[in-house]
Structure formats: structure tokens, C-alpha cells
């Protein structure tokens, strides 16, 4: 191997994808089209100054990405760049799906064009993303691929922060808990996630934490999760929001959280390593942290075999029973009903 040789890196990446496919594992690529590292030295700016970036009414560069700029996906050449590069990843590297970073910065038309383009190659390719931005965008919100506009996206999913924060607590405050911490009035938000963010007669949308109306056409458009690479991992969030929590309590609440995720009608998403109680030492955003923080401690498999076995059992349960994978909203409304339960309990 030679990390300084581009041809070697390309070859090894292809070999990696091929090996994963042989093992029955599909590969999803995290793509970040919403910003560049800077503007002045970017290839976009050198080729066509200011064309590829959005600007505010007063001529300043807009910063919907929170990284100093935002790209203008609605412009023909930026749209073509996104389309052609996605198709290249599929055709040349055999990528099976794409996770769009800050998808809410991109316009709806471009995202639907990407979906249509990959459908021509392989309709099973899964596309989803973060249905939000990191700041105000210099483009009409109703034309952006925000979570609230997911019903305008064809076959594209979005992360469900409604369910995430109902379980663990709000994004804005690591020390505040949610359903797992026994906080009141989280039931409707959790139920909304369980049905896949569709409209359901047993859910009072006015009591859902963020969304006041359904935002998916199909449960497959909702990604159900409780933590990801951003923010605190689940173990750290539980420690932060529940002072004095014991290890036994932490494990039980961790398993409860993933029970909600893996029995919901959305597409379940689990942060790598959480099946063995991954711990990033309380680092909130570890993208620039060393391996001592981001590594996977495989010794945890020996420390917490019961956690790994429980996760495995949940996955096996989901795969074995179609009731957890209903194909459309009508089937969910027909077959999934919530039972009467006391406050602090959700049963279905």
C-alpha cells in the first residue's frame, strides 16, 4: 500500500467495496457537496468566480453550511457536477447509496434529479440525508431539501430528529434528557418516529416536539436513530443527561433506545460501535479528534457481550418479521396501533 499514490488509493478503495460486497454488505458513501473548505482557493472559484456559491442580498457569501460558504446546487453547472459525480461513484466504484451532508442546503429539484439519475442505473440505491442546514440559506426554504419538504422528494429519506431528541433529549442541551431520562410529554414524539413520520390517527401532532405535520409519504423516507457521528454518542449523552447513572442503568436505557429504533417503521441507523457501548470520552464533535477518541475498542465485545447479543437479537427480529418493515403508509395505519398506556409508557 502507498497512501501517497492516487492510483493505489483508487485501487484499494475499489478492492474494499468489492470485499464488502462479497461479504453481503452494501456500501453507502457520505457526500458533502454543500460547501468547500474555502472560497478563494477552491477549484470552483478559479473556474468561474462566484458562480458556484450563493450570496445574500447585500453581496456577502451565504453560510448555510456553517463552514463559511454554501454551494448553489440550483445553478446548472453545480447541479451537473453533483449529478455526474454521483453517477461516477455508482458506475466506477459500485457504491450502493449516498448520505447527503446538510441536504437541506441543496434544492429539491437537484435532489430529485439525482434520484432519477441513479434509478436509471440501479433503483435499489438508497439516498438519504440531513434534512436541515447549519444556518440560513440564500435560497427559498420551501425549495430546499429540508426535512419538512421530504414529501416533495421522490424516494429520498431524511434523519428523524423528532425521534432522536424525544429519546435522548434536545440537540441544544446535552444535559437535558428525554424519554430515556423519564422526561414527561415525550410520548407523542416517540410514537411519531415509530410510525415512520407518516400521518397516523392515534398521534396528536400538536404534541410532537418539532414537526406539526407528517413529513414523509412512506416510512422508508424516515431514518430512525438516536445518535450518529455528530454530537455525543449515546453512552455519553446518557451520562450527561442523567447525573449519577449507574452502569446497569446505562445499559438498560441504551438497549431501550435501540429497541425503539429497531422496531420503528423507519430505516434504522446505528452508529458504528454502539453495539458494544462505544464511548468517545465525552467529546461532542470528534471530527478533529485523534484515534484515542474515535477508535473502536474491540475489548468492549468481551466487556459487554449482553449488549452485542441484544442488538443482534433486535436486528434478527426486524429481519424475521415483516410487521417491522411495512412497505407504505396505508399498511402502517392499518396494522400498527398504539395501546392505552400510562404516562411515560409507549406500547404498540
Question: Where does each model-flagged region fall?
Answer:
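Short, solvent-exposed turn/loop segments enriched in Gly/Ser/Thr/Pro and often Arg
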Residues: 31-41, 102-107, 130-134, 269-280, ...
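Acyl/amide activation-and-transfer machinery of modular secondary-metabolite enzymes
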Residues: 287-296
Amino acid at each position: 500500500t502507498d497512501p501517497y499514490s492516487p492510483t493505489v488509493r483508487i485501487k484499494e478503495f475499489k478492492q474494499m467495496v468489492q470485499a464488502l460486497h462479497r461479504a453481503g454488505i452494501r456500501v453507502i458513501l457520505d457526500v458533502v457537496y454543500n460547501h468547500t473548505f474555502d472560497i478563494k482557493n477552491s477549484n470552483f472559484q478559479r473556474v468561474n468566480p462566484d458562480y458556484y456559491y450563493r450570496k445574500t442580498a447585500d453581496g456577502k457569501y451565504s453560510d448555510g453550511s456553517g463552514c463559511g460558504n454554501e454551494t448553489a446546487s440550483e445553478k446548472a453547472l453545480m447541479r451537473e457536477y453533483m449529478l455526474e459525480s454521483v453517477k461516477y461513484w455508482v458506475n466506477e466504484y459500485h457504491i450502493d447509496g449516498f448520505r447527503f451532508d446538510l441536504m437541506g442546503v441543496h434544492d429539491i429539484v437537484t435532489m430529485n434529479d439525482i434520484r432519477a439519475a441513479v434509478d436509471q442505473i440501479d433503483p435499489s440505491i438508497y439516498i438519504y440525508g440531513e434534512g436541515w442546514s447549519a444556518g440560513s440559506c440564500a435560497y427559498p426554504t420551501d425549495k430546499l431539501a429540508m426535512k419538512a419538504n421530504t414529501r416533495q422528494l421522490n424516494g429520498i429519506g431524511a434523519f428523524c430528529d423528532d425521534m432522536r431528541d424525544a429519546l435522548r433529549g434536545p440537540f441544544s442541551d446535552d444535559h437535558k434528557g428525554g424519554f430515556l431520562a423519564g422526561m414527561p410529554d415525550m410520548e407523542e414524539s416517540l410514537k411519531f418516529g415509530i410510525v415512520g413520520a407518516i400521518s397516523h390517527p392515534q398521534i396528536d401532532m400538536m404534541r410532537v416536539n418539532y414537526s406539526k405535520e407528517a413529513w414523509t409519504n412512506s416510512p422508508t423516507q424516515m431514518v430512525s436513530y438516536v445518535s450518529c457521528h455528530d454530537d455525543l454518542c449515546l453512552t455519553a449523552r446518557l451520562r450527561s443527561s442523567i447525573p449519577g447513572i449507574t452502569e446497569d442503568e446505562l445499559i438498560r436505557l441504551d438497549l431501550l433506545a435501540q429497541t425503539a429504533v429497531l422496531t420503528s417503521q423507519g430505516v434504522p441507523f446505528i452508529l458504528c460501535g454502539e453495539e458494544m457501548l462505544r464511548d468517545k470520552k465525552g467529546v461532542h464533535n470528534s471530527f478533529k479528534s485523534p484515534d484515542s477518541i474515535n477508535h473502536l475498542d474491540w475489548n468492549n465485545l468481551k466487556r459487554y457481550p449482553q449488549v452485542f447479543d441484544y442488538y443482534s437479537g433486535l436486528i434478527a427480529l426486524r429481519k424475521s418479521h415483516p410487521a417491522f418493515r411495512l412497505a407504505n403508509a396505508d399498511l402502517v395505519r392499518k396494522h400498527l396501533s398504539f395501546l392505552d398506556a400510562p404516562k411515560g409508557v409507549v406500547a404498540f
